[in-house]
Amino acid sequence: MKVRASVKKICDKCKVIKRKGTVRIICPANPRHKQRQG
């Protein structure tokens, strides 16, 4: 999980999700693409 100030989709499979006020990116294809804003 990468924690970044600005999260962007890395590939086409990445999805932007908002959980408890934080923006997250999850990727079923490549788990390395997981990100969280913070």
Swiss-Prot record:
Decide whether keyword Ribosomal protein is in the record. Answer: yes
Provide the leader sequence positions: none
- GO molecular-function annotation terms? structural constituent of ribosome
In terms of Pfam families, this protein maps to: Ribosomal_L36
Keyword list (alphabetical) reads: Ribonucleoprotein, Ribosomal protein
GO biological process: one example: translation
Which SUPFAM superfamilies does this entry report, sorted A to Z? Ribosomal protein L36 (SSF57840)
Say if the entry is tagged with keyword Ribosomal protein.
yes
Q: Which GO terms describe its cellular component?
A: cytoplasm; ribonucleoprotein complex; ribosome
Write down the NCBIfam families for this protein, in alphabetical order.
rpmJ_bact
Which PANTHER family does this one have? 50S RIBOSOMAL PROTEIN L36, CHLOROPLASTIC, LARGE RIBOSOMAL SUBUNIT PROTEIN BL36C
Q: Which family does it belong to?
A: Belongs to the bacterial ribosomal protein bL36 family.
Protein known as: Large ribosomal subunit protein bL36
Record the organism. Answer: Anaeromyxobacter sp. (strain Fw109-5)
